[in-house]
Structures are given as C-alpha cells and as structure tokens.
C-alpha cells in the first residue's frame, strides 16, 4: 500500500506543480499605429506644343457624286420584273460598310430624289420614317442597319417594298449595292451595284 500512496502523492504533487505553472493571461499590447505609405504617382505631362507647330488637319472627305451613282441603278430597278405599280416603297438609309467615313445621308437623299415622280412607287416620306424609327426605338443614324430591321420598319409604315442600300469597299473607291425586297416575304426581287462616281 505504500507504493499506492506514494504513487497517489506523486500524482497529486505533479498536479500541484503543473497548476502552479499556469501563467496569468497577458494583456495584449496596443498595436503600434501604421501609417499608410502612398507610392508617388508619376503623371505624364502632355507634350507642349511649340509656337508655330501645326497640328495636321484631318483627312478631307472626297466629294462623291451620289446623283450620278444612283440614277443608272434606279433606272435599272424600275425596269425590273415583278414590280407592281402603285405600291409603297420604303427607302432605308444607306449603310456605310466602307473602311472610312462616308456621307451616307447625302447618298440616301440622292436615292430619294432619283425616285421622286417615278411612276412605279409611292415613297414613304422622311417624316413618316422618322416617326416610325422613334416609335420602334431606332435612332435616325442607326449604324446597325440590317435587312431585317429595314423590313420590320417597312411593315410598320405599311410599305410593300423596301430598298436596302449598302456602300462597301475601300473609301477611296467605294461601290454602292442596292437591293429591292418584297416586304411580305423578304425576297430580293432585284439587286444591282455600281462604283460610286467621284
């Protein structure tokens, strides 16, 4: 029994020694304030223009003769088979698919002038077209002109035909493509193209 008492005493002594080793919890030290360091920002200074140094002018738009370009094409179109006289025609804005800036509004105006008093079609007026574009949420200068949008616009204004036009190629020598489409089916009933006259 003495070994048991010694063993128990040893365990108790060990427990007392270990319990005396527990340190008091230390209070956390306040953190030292850290000041953020902002890296220096190097702003590049624009080069100063010296007096007398000229800025090059933007490239000039080449004058294009839209009337001379569209007249022969419109003449061919009016002689095409399958056109019923007296129907309403919507002339959509000329789409610019060239590699530069093109005065497509002048091209559209030349198409409208060439089709006035043609004897085949009644034209949708620019006012009707502008109102329809606004109602359908299309801007007047919609650069995403597509055949489906043109047909949808023609249906909205009650036209039976739509003239879709696209200027394409190099801006120095563009070509104009015209397509007369039947609104009801979307069928292209006439197509023609020609070089734009300078």
UniProtKB/Swiss-Prot annotation:
Ordered alphabetically, the record's keywords are: Cell outer membrane, Cell shape, Lipoprotein, Membrane, Palmitate, Peptidoglycan synthesis, Signal
What does the UniProt function comment say about this protein? Answer: Regulator of peptidoglycan synthesis that is essential for the function of penicillin-binding protein 1B (PBP1b).
User: Could you tell me which Pfam families the record lists for this protein?
Assistant: LpoB (PF13036)
Protein name stated in the entry: Penicillin-binding protein activator LpoB
Compartment(s): Cell outer membrane
What PROSITE patterns does the entry give?
PROKAR_LIPOPROTEIN
Its cellular-component GO annotations read: periplasmic side of cell outer membrane
Q: Which family does it belong to?
A: Belongs to the LpoB family.
Q: Where is the composition biased (Pro residues)?
A: 30-61
Supply the NCBIfam families for this chain.
lp (TIGR02722)
* GO terms, biological process: peptidoglycan biosynthetic process; regulation of cell shape
Indicate yes or no for the key word DNA-binding: no
